[in-house]
Amino acid sequence: QLQQGLTRAFAWATDITPTILSFAGVELPGPRYAGRPVLPITGKDLSPVLMGESDRIYAAHETVGYELTGHAVLFQGDYKIVVNQPPAGDGQWRLYNIVTDPGETDDLSAQQPQRFQEMLSGYETYKRENRVLSLPPGYSQMRQLFSNALQERYGANITVMILALIVLLPFFI
């Protein structure tokens, strides 16, 4: 029986699939599907929390990491380290207690240096295990977004157009 109300249990997007599969009575897939290798599902089944059997899914020592275009985060227990790259941030890691400071206004990295370093090490482990690539120097999200949009819109034609522009430009200058 699903419990009504709000839970304070930590959950992440990766937990949705195992939870739905659990409620549907479907086993998690193995390492192969239709003869092809598949990546493992990394999330956890939230049904014990949703059924009122547990108040948390992740133990205090377990970590959940995430990275997108250089912005990165690692959750562990009540804490979170986060880095936001320019222009949204300054590229500096920060530590927050997300239970007592959900607005993330009080950076605890200087007050809790040991926890901060342990979580940075945890993020490096996440990065290595998940083959997260470091961004090249000078990386710009906006430039990459623009480049991807051009490539999607014009495909291989964009390369031909740029080369033609380079060849023909001297005749117009």
Predicted region positions:
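Long, internal low-complexity/basic segments
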Residues: 16, 21, 81, 86-92, ...
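C-terminal cap/loop subdomain of S1 sulfatases and analogous C-terminal strand-loop tails that border
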Residues: 2-5, 9-98, 149-153
